[in-house]
UniProtKB/Swiss-Prot annotation:
This is Endophilin-A1. The modification Phosphotyrosine is found at Y299. GO terms for biological process: cellular response to brain-derived neurotrophic factor stimulus; central nervous system development; dendrite extension; negative regulation of blood-brain barrier permeability; negative regulation of epidermal growth factor receptor signaling pathway; negative regulation of gene expression; negative regulation of MAPK cascade; neuron projection development. Implicated in synaptic vesicle endocytosis. May recruit other proteins to membranes with high curvature. Required for BDNF-dependent dendrite outgrowth. Cooperates with SH3GL2 to mediate BDNF-NTRK2 early endocytic trafficking and signaling from early endosomes. Residues 1-27, 245-289 are annotated as: Disordered. The modification Phosphoserine is found at S262. It comes from Homo sapiens (Human).
């Protein structure tokens, strides 16, 4: 910096100290200017905080945000493509549901239901990723550009204006001791900076409808996300309700204990295989010859209508006819009647 420049900086510092410590009066800016300056300051603080809070809203886990930021920074340093996106909570939940749905398998109700809901959660995570991208492009990035360009430029003009004001006020106090031309030039520079700062603030505040458009983009992105989320959840709800309906229409299976082990003690020199342990099975119902069409009852069936044949679980029923795809006709204990096919298992099929 030149000697003249150092001298000017010293004069500004002297004037600033005299105002703060000595109570000297500086040149006052008009109320309209100060109101614009206040609004610009609020706008600047609002932009910064809203950007931060929006990112926290979209990506609520601070640890995941920090890790993602580090990965993206390292990828940029290495010249690699952008790293992975934010791990959505819906994606993590989907992964767990799909994993355990596969482990449980399809021969139960819970496993397939987990798979369906897990798939819905995966779709929700993809929609959430789209929301993140949409909000960043149409809301966060424009606000960042506003902060980095327009607001930073205004701050530069205001800082320059303050420096020229201090220079003008310092010289004004020494009027008569310095050349009038030097004071006049200081006033012209002050007025010039004031006009530039005033104009830039006015243009920013006058065009604030752009920020309204950006807010609208934020709301529209959220609306689209929630529409798609509702559609996904409604579809999986229908499938789950259908599963519940089908399961409730199926007869409930009863627990059938397996044969218990019995302990047989050897007599004399005889030996028993398996260390003297044997299995005793439950006796099979008798009274039906297994060379004729018959079936075994899987569940109890209580007749509700005339002509139906009631039976207990494990009964062996003689088959006489198949009425249709849902009903058999058979005999048990001298009684004849109809009963549902899905309540029995075939031992000897009816001849075709």
């Amino acid at each position: 910096m030149s000697v003249a420049g150092l001298k000017k900086q010293f004069h500004k510092a002297t004037q600033k100290v005299s105002e703060k410590v000595g109570g000297a009066e500086g040149t006052k800016l008009d109320d309209d200017f100060k109101e614009m300056e206040r609004k610009v300051d609020v706008t600047s603080r609002a932009v910064m905080e809203i950007m931060t809070k929006t990112i926290e809203y979209l990506q609520p886990n601070p640890a995941s945000r920090a890790k993602l930021s580090m990965i993206n920074t390292m990828s940029k340093i290495r010249g690699q493509e952008k790293g992975p996106g934010y791990p959505q909570a819906e994606a993590l939940l989907a992964e767990a549901m799909l994993k355990f749905g596969r482990e449980l398998g399809d021969d139960c109700n819970f496993g397939p239901a987990l798979g369906e809901v897990g798939e819905a959660m995966r779709e929700l995570s993809e929609v959430k990723d789209s929301l993140d991208i949409e909000v960043k492009q149409n809301f966060i990035d424009p606000l960042q550009n506003l902060h980095d360009k327009d607001l930073r430029e205004i701050q530069h003009h205001l800082k320059k204006l303050e420096g020229r004001r201090l220079d003008f006020d310092y010289k004004k106090k020494r009027q008569g001791k310095i050349p009038d031309e030097e004071l006049r030039q200081a006033l012209e520079k002050f007025d010039e900076s004031k006009e530039i700062a005033e104009s830039s603030m006015f243009n920013l505040l006058e065009m604030d409808i752009e920020q309204v458009s950006q807010l609208s983009a934020l709301v529209q992105a959220q609306l689209e996300y929630h529409k798609q989320a509702v559609q996904i959840l409604q579809q999986v709800t229908v499938r789950l309700e259908e599963r519940i309906r089908q399961a409730s229409s199926q007869p409930r299976r009863e627990y059938q204990p397996k044969p218990r082990m019995s302990l047989e003690f050897p007599t004399g020199d005889s030996t028993q295989p398996n260390g003297g342990l044997s299995h005793t099975g439950t006796p099979k119902p008798s009274g039906v010859q297994m060379d004729q069409p018959c079936c075994r009852a899987l569940y109890d069936f209580e007749p509700e209508n005339e002509g139906e044949l009631g039976f207990k679980e494990g009964d062996i029923i003689t088959l006489t006819n198949q009425i249709d795809e849902n009903w058999y006709e058979g005999m048990l204990h001298g009684h004849s009647g109809f009963f549902p096919i899905n309540y029995v298992e075939i031992l000897v099929a009816l001849p075709h």
